[in-house]
Design a protein with these regions (language model features):
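RNA pseudouridine synthases
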Residues: 1-241
Length: 241
């Protein structure tokens, strides 16, 4: 990121034409020779987390877990200890795939922290590769149930857009007309709740054809029907008493 590069420059880690330069505003000239000294980041060791996993299926290759809302999938900024991965280390640290990120052993796919539902964990690299191929080919069906503000018309349909990182908040995603990755969400209204005392709510099933970051949340927000309880992509509605 820009801030990391600036910090490297201010810490005398940049040489231009073999001379240390610690001025981030230095303007490069044609022919300048640039050297960066970048120290490898220290990998956080994964600590076991005593957390009761709701295991619905397990064999020699996979573990299927019913993830609760409120727990992150894997370690990240601000939380390196209390995640599903840490709980898996505590449960079965010697039998998890090690393909990819060292902080995500066994993790083939993810769901958001405040989302509950089934996740599949790979216990070995062969299972990880097979599962990854299935997710990439979209041969695994993923259906999510959610409660949204308002009601969608038509009550059943497909949302197909490009999704990219928000230009205003790098921790959020947004729909774009010109850039990003294709995102496809099929939705169906199951039930509508409406009365004179509270805002209208709708219960939906959403089936994903792609798996972009925050895809359903972004698509619902794009339609103007954000998910109830979603503080990041919420619309302003009066509180339900």
């Amino acid at each position: 990121s820009r801030s990391k590069v600036k910090k490297l420059i201010l810490s005398n880690n940049l040489k231009i034409n073999q001379v240390i330069v610690n001025d981030p505003s230095y303007v490069l000239k044609l022919g300048d020779n640039i050297e960066f000294c970048i120290q490898p980041e220290k990998i956080q060791s994964l600590k076991p987390y005593e957390y009761k996993l709701d295991i619905v299926f397990e064999d020699d290759d996979i573990i299927v877990i019913n993830k609760s809302s409120g727990i992150s999938m894997h370690p990240g900024a601000g939380n390196y200890d209390n995640t599903i991965v840490n709980a898996l280390i505590n449960y079965n640290k010697n039998s998890l795939s090690n393909i990819g990120d060292e902080l995500r052993p066994g993790i083939v796919h993810r769901i958001d922290k405040n989302t509950s539902g089934l996740i599949v964990v790979a216990k070995n690299n062969q299972a990880h590769e097979h599962l990854s191929k299935q997710f990439n080919k979209h041969s695994i069906t993923r259906i999510y149930q959610l409660l949204i503000w308002g009601k969608i018309r038509p009550s059943k349909g497909k949302i197909e857009t490009l999704i990219t990182r928000s230009s205003k908040n790098r921790q959020m995603m947004e729909v774009s007309r010109t850039k990003g990755k294709k995102a496809i969400t099929n939705y169906e209204t199951l039930q509508i709740f409406e009365n004179d005392k509270t805002p209208t709510l709708s219960l939906l099933n959403c089936k994903l054809e792609t798996g972009r970051t925050h895809q359903i949340r972004v698509h619902m927000n794009y339609l103007g029907n954000s998910i109830v309880g979603d503080d990041k992509y919420k619309k302003k509605f009066k509180k339900i008493k």
